[in-house]
């Protein structure tokens, strides 16, 4: 499978959940470089404030500190967004085995909240 160049309509707005983490912050930066608007949602539990700080002065970047386990936060984050790139999750298979309820609440129910908020908000595409 080869690389395919994808373009989006002008003034498209992206939401990157987990946007203060390694992958999420790099996605935010790449999307901004393409000239699109980016909203980042992260609770900073594993993401880094420094990743937010390096982008915060860009007028096309918005940061929301919030938790995907809260549906109201997800609804606010999805408002006016065209595309959601869901990177918010707790990693580590060993820890997920040690703390399954915690991981289920965040990774499964949090993603479900994001999907429902995206559906209700009319988001065009949801990538997870």
Residue ranges of model-derived segments:
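N-terminal Rossmann-like NAD(P)+-binding domain of SDR-like oxidoreductases, especially those catalyzing
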Residues: 1-128
């Amino acid at each position: 499978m080869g690389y395919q160049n994808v373009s989006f309509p002008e003034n498209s707005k992206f939401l990157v959940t987990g946007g203060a983490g390694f992958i999420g912050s790099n996605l935010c930066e790449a999307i901004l470089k393409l000239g699109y608007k980016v909203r980042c949602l992260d609770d900073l539990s594993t993401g880094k404030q420094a990743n937010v700080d390096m982008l915060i002065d860009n007028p096309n970047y918005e940061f929301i500190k919030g938790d995907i386990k809260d549906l109201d936060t997800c609804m606010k984050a999805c408002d006016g967004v065209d595309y959601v790139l869901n990177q918010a999750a707790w990693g580590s298979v060993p820890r997920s085995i040690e703390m399954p309820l915690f991981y289920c609440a965040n990774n499964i129910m949090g993603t479900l909240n994001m999907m429902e908020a995206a559906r209700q908000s009319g988001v065009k595409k949801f990538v997870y």
